[in-house]
């Protein structure tokens, strides 16, 4: 006699599969692969990296049990309070010591604090920085002392590198009057650097062409930053124009009003 076929509901099938997974499937998945065979497609959880730690403790203490017996747990014993969470706390920055000059960070020997992704993916692999260990700090302190004593070549500072980068993109205009005789000198150029570009340049750090500049035209000047880097800045000598300040604009308005008043009086 043939056995009768019954249709198993889909919900029952899913429940049976779930029970089978709970019995053996998950255990096999979590069991460490200790054999020397080639690993399969399952992930080896025993060798996976722990990315964080969460420490909790019971809110209610579990009473002591007799020898050889397990303590009796109640529902209140399954209430926990958080002690420490290293997985979700803010990530700390990475302290490094620069071995070379890096834009917007610093120069060799500077102690910087950057994101871990920046340090591990860019600075450390490219050899631009090293870890700020006590040994490395001591080495760079000794190097700094040797540079101060003059036994090693000096290096450009962070502000100096920013100044050099800025000067390479500048164009200086020097205004000279046409009613007097003049000759351009480093003091005049230094004042125009401060007035037009906002850069303080010492006269001894400026170098002009050997031929005297007594006429308007296109010239150049060289600026030496901290005695290390020299930048050639294009320079235009133009006719002097009075700066259009509020006081000067008010004076121009008064002159225009006086001129209009005199013209109308002559017509009358």
Swiss-Prot record:
GO terms for biological process: translation. Pfam families: bL9m_N, Ribosomal_bL9m_C, Ribosomal_L9_N. InterPro entries: MRP-L9_N, Ribosomal_bL9, Ribosomal_bL9/RNase_H1_N, Ribosomal_bL9_N, Ribosomal_bL9_N_sf, Ribosomal_bL9m_C. Residues 1-52 form a transit peptide. It is found in: Mitochondrion. GO terms for molecular function: structural constituent of ribosome. Its main location: mitochondrion. Keywords: Mitochondrion, Ribonucleoprotein, Ribosomal protein, Transit peptide. GO terms for cellular component: mitochondrial inner membrane; mitochondrial large ribosomal subunit; mitochondrion. Belongs to the bacterial ribosomal protein bL9 family. Component of the mitochondrial ribosome large subunit (39S) which comprises a 16S rRNA and about 50 distinct proteins. This is Large ribosomal subunit protein bL9m. The lineage of its organism: Eukaryota, Metazoa, Chordata, Craniata, Vertebrata. The gene is MRPL9.
């Amino acid at each position: 006699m043939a056995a009768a076929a019954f249709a198993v509901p889909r919900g029952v099938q899913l429940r049976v599969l779930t029970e089978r997974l709970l019995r053996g499937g998950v255990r096999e998945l979590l069991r460490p692969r200790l054999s020397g065979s080639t690993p399969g497609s399952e992930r080896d959880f025993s060798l996976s990296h722990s990315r964080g730690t969460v420490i909790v403790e019971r809110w209610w203490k579990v009473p002591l049990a007799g020898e050889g017996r397990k303590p009796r747990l109640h529902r209140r014993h399954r209430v926990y309070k958080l002690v420490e969470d290293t997985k979700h706390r803010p990530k700390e920055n990475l302290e490094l010591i620069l071995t070379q000059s890096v834009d917007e960070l610093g120069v060799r020997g500077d102690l910087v604090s950057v994101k871990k992704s920046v340090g591990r993916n860019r600075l450390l692999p490219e050899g631009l920085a090293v870890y700020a260990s006590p040994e490395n700090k001591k080495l760079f302190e000794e190097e700094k002392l040797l540079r101060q004593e003059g036994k090693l070549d000096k290096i450009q500072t962070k502000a100096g590198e920013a100044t050099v980068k800025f000067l390479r993109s500048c164009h200086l205009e020097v205004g000279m009057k046409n009613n007097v005789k003049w000759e351009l000198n480093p003091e005049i150029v230094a004042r125009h650097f401060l007035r037009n570009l906002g850069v303080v340049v010492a006269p001894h750090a400026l170098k002009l062409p050997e031929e005297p500049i007594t006429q308007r035209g296109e010239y150049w000047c060289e600026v030496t930053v901290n005695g290390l880097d020299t930048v050639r800045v294009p320079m235009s000598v133009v006719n002097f124009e009075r700066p259009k300040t509020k006081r000067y604009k008010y004076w121009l308005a008064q002159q225009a009003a006086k001129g209009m008043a005199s013209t109308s009086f002559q017509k009358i």
